[in-house]
Amino acid sequence: MAALGMLLSTGVRRLHCGSAARAGSQWRLRQGLAANPSGYGPLTELPDWSYADGRPAPPMKGQLRRKAQREKFARRVVLLSQEMDAGLQAWQLRQQEKLQEEKRKQQNALKPKGVLLQNPGPSQ
C-alpha cells in the first residue's frame, strides 16, 4: 500500500501504448486514411481558423514543416527517377555497343582459304 501511495504522490503516469492504442489503424488504412489520425488529412492540413472577412489564416509551423518535408521527398523522387532513366539509357547504349562489337567480330573473322574459297558451294 505504501508503494501505491508513493506512486500516486509522485504524479508519474505511465501510459500503455500497446495494441489497444493502434486498434483502429487497420480500419483506417483499409478506408484509405492515415494509420494515425493526426498523420495527414483535413484536421492536420487545413488551418484551425480564418479571419472574419474570409482571408485564410497564416500557415502554422507544423504545416510549414510538413510542406517542406513533402517538397524534399518530391525532389528526391524526381532525382532518383532521373538517375534511373539515365542508368537505363546507359545500359541500353552498352547493350547496343555489345551487339555492334559482336557483328564487327563476325565480319572480321578469318575467312576460309584455298579450295573452299574457289568453290563457293553449300557449306557443310
Curated annotation (Swiss-Prot):
GO CC list: mitochondrial inner membrane; mitochondrial large ribosomal subunit
Keywords from the named record: Mitochondrion, Ribonucleoprotein, Ribosomal protein, Transit peptide
Compartments where located: Mitochondrion
Keyword Secreted: no
Superkingdom of source: Eukaryota
Keyword Ribonucleoprotein attributed: yes
GO molecular function: structural constituent of ribosome
Main location group: mitochondrion
One record GO biological process: mitochondrial translation
PANTHER family from the UniProt entry: 39S RIBOSOMAL PROTEIN L52, MITOCHONDRIAL (PTHR34090), LARGE RIBOSOMAL SUBUNIT PROTEIN ML52 (PTHR34090:SF1)
Binding partners and assembly: Component of the mitochondrial ribosome large subunit (39S) which comprises a 16S rRNA and about 50 distinct proteins.
Name the UniProt record assigns to this protein: Large ribosomal subunit protein mL52
